[in-house]
């Protein structure tokens, strides 16, 4: 598949571009680069910014790994592919800002190919992006979802609603009965209508991520905050850790396939905390997060209704 090289080139360019733009807006730290090889096949390049003015930690990882047999996390939904050799490539990133008023964000775009001698390769794309605020701002939520909607629109009216719901369903902590954040887009097993269109869609998602995120960073990075906001941010980061270690398929695939643990766990926040039976004060900004932002909402429909009324 000659198209695989084009995907790899795009992913490497995406990683470079995102790192350059994040370092520019941070202004206090740059990305350290760590190239690595995987004994079972393949390798990657992890880039991590730590201790910045804006970002406490930002990790942007590229990997292209190969293996002789699909791990259980990848073949559970496709038992017909069990035992096939595979290659997987992608860019995955998580950004943990210092300010509690800037949301944590995550994005991922990837290509997976399962191969068997004498048969056509089975391929699919996956990915998306999602936002995890600690303090909710409706303006930010609407902008985030408007960006997601607009990049999906050229691919069909049904794409944004479908992948928005998939994101709401996926980034949900079942053991807490609580969403991780306000969602965005999530998709997997994308192979229709063809390779070129699917590839065009992941380019739109990858390139659209910073269009959604950087304006929010700019709006919130200079807001003053104190110990109360920081403590709540660290408490909510605990939910991020719980999701990644218990529910996230990407984390499980990486660990089960003998992936590089340092790169897989790059998504973890540098600091987090847990508190027994924490309850936010009624009517507080912290309570508002649970009340108005974590329950799944159609942000764009509400925004359009409000604009018509105005």
UniProtKB/Swiss-Prot annotation:
Kindly identify the residues recorded as the active site: 106
Annotated substrate binding lies at: 92, 108-110, 258-260
Signal peptide positions on this chain: none
Q: Which cysteines are joined by disulfide bonds?
A: none
User: What Enzyme Commission number(s) does the record list for this chain?
Assistant: 1.3.3.3
The highest taxon in the source lineage is Bacteria
According to the record, the residues making up region (Important for dimerization) are: 240-275
UniProt pathway:
Porphyrin-containing compound metabolism; protoporphyrin-IX biosynthesis; protoporphyrinogen-IX from coproporphyrinogen-III (O2 route): step 1/1
One Gene Ontology cellular component annotation held by this UniProt entry: cytoplasm
Subcellular compartments: Cytoplasm
Top enzyme class of this protein? oxidoreductase
- Give any single GO term for biological process: protoporphyrinogen IX biosynthetic process
Q: Which reaction does it catalyse?
A: coproporphyrinogen III + O2 + 2 H(+) = protoporphyrinogen IX + 2 CO2 + 2 H2O
**Marked site: Important for dimerization:** 175
Recall the GO molecular function terms of this protein's record: coproporphyrinogen oxidase activity; metal ion binding; protein homodimerization activity
The UniProt keyword set, sorted, is: Cytoplasm, Heme biosynthesis, Metal-binding, Oxidoreductase, Porphyrin biosynthesis
Database matches in InterPro entries? Coprogen_oxidase_aer, Coprogen_oxidase_aer_sf, Coprogen_oxidase_CS
Q: State the needed cofactors, names only.
A: a divalent metal cation
Could you say which residues bind a divalent metal cation here?
Answer: 96, 106, 145, 175
Q: How does it assemble?
A: Homodimer.
Give the record's family classification: Belongs to the aerobic coproporphyrinogen-III oxidase family.
Instruction: Explain the purpose of this protein.
Output: Involved in the heme biosynthesis. Catalyzes the aerobic oxidative decarboxylation of propionate groups of rings A and B of coproporphyrinogen-III to yield the vinyl groups in protoporphyrinogen-IX.
This protein's name: Oxygen-dependent coproporphyrinogen-III oxidase
């Amino acid at each position: 598949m000659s198209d695989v090289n084009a995907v790899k080139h795009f992913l490497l360019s995406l990683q470079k571009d995102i790192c350059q733009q994040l370092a520019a807006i941070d202004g206090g730290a740059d990305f350290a680069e760590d190239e690595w090889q995987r004994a079972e096949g393949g390798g990657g390049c992890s880039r991590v910014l730590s201790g910045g003015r804006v970002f406490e930690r930002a990790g942007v990882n590229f990997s292209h790994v190969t293996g002789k047999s699909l791990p259980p996390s990848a073949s559970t939904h496709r038992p017909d592919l069990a035992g096939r050799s595979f290659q997987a490539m992608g860019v995955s990133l998580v950004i943990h800002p210092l300010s509690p008023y800037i949301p944590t964000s995550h994005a991922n775009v990837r290509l997976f190919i399962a191969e068997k001698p004498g048969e056509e390769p089975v391929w699919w794309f996956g990915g998306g992006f999602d936002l995890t605020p600690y303090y909710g701002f409706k303006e930010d939520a609407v902008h985030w979802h408007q960006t997601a909607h607009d990049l999906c629109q050229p691919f069909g009216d049904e794409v944004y609603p479908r992948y928005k719901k998939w994101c709401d369903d996926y980034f949900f902590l079942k053991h807490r009965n609580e969403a991780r954040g306000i969602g965005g887009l999530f998709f997997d097993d994308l192979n229709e209508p063809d390779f070129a269109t699917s590839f065009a869609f992941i380019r739109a998602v990858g390139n659209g991520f910073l269009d959604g995120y950087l304006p929010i960073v700019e709006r919130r990075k200079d807001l003053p905050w104190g110990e109360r906001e920081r403590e709540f941010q660290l408490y909510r980061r605990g939910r991020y850790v719980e999701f990644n270690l218990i529910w996230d398929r990407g984390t499980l695939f990486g660990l089960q396939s003998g992936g590089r643990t340092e790169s897989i766990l790059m998504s973890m926040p540098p600091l987090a905390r847990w508190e027994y039976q924490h309850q936010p004060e009624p009517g507080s900004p912290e309570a508002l997060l649970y009340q108005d932002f974590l329950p799944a909402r159609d942000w764009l429909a509400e925004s359009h209704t409000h604009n018509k009324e105005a």
